Each structure stands twice: as structure tokens, then as C-alpha cells.
Amino acid sequence: ARTTLVVDETMVDLWFDAPPPPPLASFCPNGNVITLGSAGKSFWGGLRLGWVRAPARTIAALAQTRDTLDLGSPLLEQLATLWLIENGDTFLPARREMLRERRDRCAALLREHFPEWRFQMPEGGLSYWVELPDMLAPQLATRAEAAGIHLGTGTRFGLSGSFDRYLRMPFSLETAELESALMRIKPLWLALNKGGQAFKRPFV
């Protein structure tokens, strides 16, 4: 009962197939629940602002702590974010549709050019969680980094190598940029996977 629950809802506005369930905090109105949101995820990546919803005493403590760390966020960006939150229903549907199209295009490219990789279609968000055979994901990420392409490896998202097989593959780029990046990754993958390693289980 004394545990503080921190809920990351930074992607909650970016659903494609079905609306998300109500906020977790709504099921525990008197509990100590901290919910995190992000204008950069919901609206535009260049808007480096987020928000926190929590009990008043928690917000007061966080605000006091923040005063010792920085001078605050730019007022103009805060006002822009407030307007976006209040008017999100007018343009979030178009953003979701754009991301849905990019998700689908990325899936088609992955299936065509990287048949050894496995993934599931995300129901929302900005990226795929891709599984590579034979623990090759960290090596591919290193080679891609040298070529100027940053891929997030699963290593940073788990302990003891539990996600070393995975890459986080964003699909939020414009289609031409996405295709260009994947075509640059393809020869790196082919050189790395000379033995043609693949999963024995069916591709999803």
C-alpha cells in the first residue's frame, strides 16, 4: 500500500488499432500513482517537454526538487504544449494514421529484405521490437553505428543479456528516409549473417 507506482504513458496517444484502456491511475484515485506523459512522443519530437500527473503532495515535492536542478522549461514551449493538449483531438487522428502507414511500410520492407528477422505488428507507438537470430543484434548495431545509423539494442532494456537478440527499429521516419536507412543496413546484415542463420519457427 505504501509503494509508489510510476506509469509510463508516453505512447498512449499513438494507438492505431484500438483506443487504449483508461489511465491506470483512474483505477486507484486515492493511491500514490505517478503518470508520465511526453509532448515529444504525442505531438512532435522537437518539443522536448513532458508532464507528470500525481497527488498534489507529490507534485509539490517534485517541483521543489526541480528548482534545484534547472531554471525551468521555456514559457513559449509550455504554452504551445498546453494548446496541443487541449486541441489534440483535432490533429492526433492524422498523426496516428501517418504512423500507421509508416508502420505498415516498414513491415513490408522488413519482410522483403530481412526475412530472417522476427517481429509482431505493434498496435501503437513509434518502433518495432525486432528479434534477430544467433545473438547478432549487438554486432549489427555496432556496424550500423559506424555507418552513421543508430539502432537501439535490447541490451540496454534488460539485464544479464536477456534481450541481446533484439533491436528497437523505429518506423517514424518519412518513407523515403526509412527505405534508405534499411537499404544501408541490408548489406551490413548480409555480411554479418553469411551463414544464413534463421529461426526454425515461422516468421510472424
Show which residues each predicted segment covers.
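Active-site pre-lysine segment of PLP-dependent enzymes
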Residues: 1-5, 9-42
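Structural signature of PLP-dependent enzymes
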Residues: 62-69, 85-107
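Conserved glycine-rich beta-strand-loop-beta hairpin in the small C-terminal domain of fold type I
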Residues: 82, 99-107, 117-131
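Short, conserved charged micro-motifs
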Residues: 135-142, 176-180
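PLP-dependent enzyme catalytic core of the Aspartate aminotransferase-like
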Residues: 146-147, 159-204
